[in-house]
């Protein structure tokens, strides 16, 4: 893992805090499929299944969060030399003392992508 640099998440975090509780449970099929044992609540914005050539679906979190998410995504993209696109985007809310354990992602989309984690706190 390497540190890319600073990313201003002020606007994204403020927008996130304004969202209704139901948004955290809106896309449960992805939570069950991708991290069934993780004790987190998740808002999914974008999901690409089947590899980077496949279409990217906008999920429930996209409409309320995309305007605040776009500057974060653009800043992250600025750390890479070649232009790409966001294949997956999600926000995970972990409980006190919880973390995401080190793991290996698999599947055509994740194997072809850079995974970037931006801590909100």
Report residues per predicted region.
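Non-heme Fe(II)/2-oxoglutarate
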Residues: 1-82
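Catalytic core of non-heme Fe(II) oxygenases with the double-stranded beta-helix
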Residues: 73-121
């Amino acid at each position: 893992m390497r540190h890319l640099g600073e990313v201003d998440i002020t606007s994204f975090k403020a927008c996130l805090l304004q969202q209704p509780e139901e948004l955290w449970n809106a896309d449960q099929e992805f939570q069950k499929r991708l991290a069934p044992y993780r004790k987190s609540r998740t808002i999914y914005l974008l999901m690409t299944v089947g590899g980077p050539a496949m279409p990217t679906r906008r999920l429930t979190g996209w409409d309320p969060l995309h305007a605040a998410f776009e500057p974060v995504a653009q800043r992250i993209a600025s750390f890479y030399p070649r232009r790409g696109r966001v294949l997956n985007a999600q926000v995970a809310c972990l409980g006190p003392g919880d973390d995401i354990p080190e793991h290996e992602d698999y599947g055509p989309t994740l194997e072809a992508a850079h995974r970037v984690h931006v801590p909100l706190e």
